[in-house]
Amino acid sequence: MERIVVTLGERSYPITIASGLFNEPASFLPLKSGEQVMLVTNETLAPLYLDKVRGVLEQAGVNVDSVILPDGEQYKSLAVLDTVFTALLQKPHGRDTTLVALGGGVVGDLTGFAAASYQRGVRFIQVPTTLLSQVDSSVGGKTAVNHPLGKNMIGAFYQPASVVVDLDCLKTLPPRELASGLAEVIKYGIILDGAFFNWLEENLDALLRLDGPAMAYCIRRCCELKAEVVAADERETGLRALLNLGHTFGHAIEAEMGYGNWLHGEAVAAGMVMAARTSERLGQFSSAETQRIITLLKRAGLPVNGPREMSAQAYLPHMLRDKKVLAGEIRLILPLAIGKSEVRSGVSHELVLNAIADCQSA
């Protein structure tokens, strides 16, 4: 069992990583006997894990209600969020309730925002079931729903009480979702840890076949890196922005193509190549390093080009609505070397459009 602490003073919390956690009531601390829980999951995961998690919580003496949401990025919306509020109010659940997010990034982000908003804030626990949510979205307290004009535009910073990562969940993960999660894994190597990127080049095949020790190390290392960044910059005023490598381009793809048509990790993968091409055009990143990124993404089964039907110009309106924009200026996360990156303002729109075009004609 691995245990990592996100250090945020009184709001510090543990990330527990192991197989078989759904069999242990102690995995769901700080829940105690007699407490009330609203378990939030989706239609895909409910048949797989709802009864198991409900059972282990009830074994601990917790009173469990549940709400089952539709599955898909297109349902990460205010309308679906309202169904969670309705379920909480119908019981009713008070300020002493705990929301448990059992699912991937959509369930986790939406449940976290529900917890931040319901009666001005209740406790919640993240139980991520996809690789992407285990290595990234469940850690750090970013919660949100989408708006038709932009991804994650309505949300809050709100930290969970704990994160419970049961590695056994990956056994039921579809290959496309596994690849999507690997995009965020590869991101950590590019922006923060060149040695980890080297390890990924050597061990990607083991991750693709869900090798237990390799996957446990991979998730632990990603969570360590994320925890360090969040502890240093919880509200994304500086260092934490680096975690958005590829996201300015990727969110544009997701919004333009319709939420759910491109998985988040797929869009981020293409976006990371666009960021690398931008950095190349600025003369601060080598084509050889871009090729290393492209090769690793391709091996993971990820796209390295944007959608053919989306023109370079179509990216700009979305990028100008990006949450990192300051004073009307796009801020990009750009690699300087494998393992090192920067936040860059003032890049000309023409250069950015040319970098996007590089990734459409490649």
From Swiss-Prot:
GO biological process: amino acid biosynthetic process; aromatic amino acid family biosynthetic process; chorismate biosynthetic process
Pathway: Metabolic intermediate biosynthesis; chorismate biosynthesis; chorismate from D-erythrose 4-phosphate and phosphoenolpyruvate: step 2/7
Keyword flag Metal-binding: yes
GO MF annotation list: 3-dehydroquinate synthase activity; metal ion binding; nucleotide binding
Catalytic activity from the UniProt record: 7-phospho-2-dehydro-3-deoxy-D-arabino-heptonate = 3-dehydroquinate + phosphate
Keywords: Amino-acid biosynthesis, Aromatic amino acid biosynthesis, Cobalt, Cytoplasm, Lyase, Metal-binding, NAD, Nucleotide-binding, Zinc
Subcellular location: Cytoplasm
Disulphides: none
EC number, as in UniProt: 4.2.3.4
CC cofactor: Co(2+); Zn(2+); NAD(+)
A single Gene Ontology CC term: cytoplasm
Amino acids binding NAD(+): 71-76, 105-109, 129-130, 142, 151, 169-172
Residue numbers binding Zn(2+): E184, H247, H264
UniProt keyword Signal present: no
Described function: Catalyzes the conversion of 3-deoxy-D-arabino-heptulosonate 7-phosphate (DAHP) to dehydroquinate (DHQ).
Name recorded for this polypeptide: 3-dehydroquinate synthase
Originating organism: Escherichia coli O139:H28 (strain E24377A / ETEC)
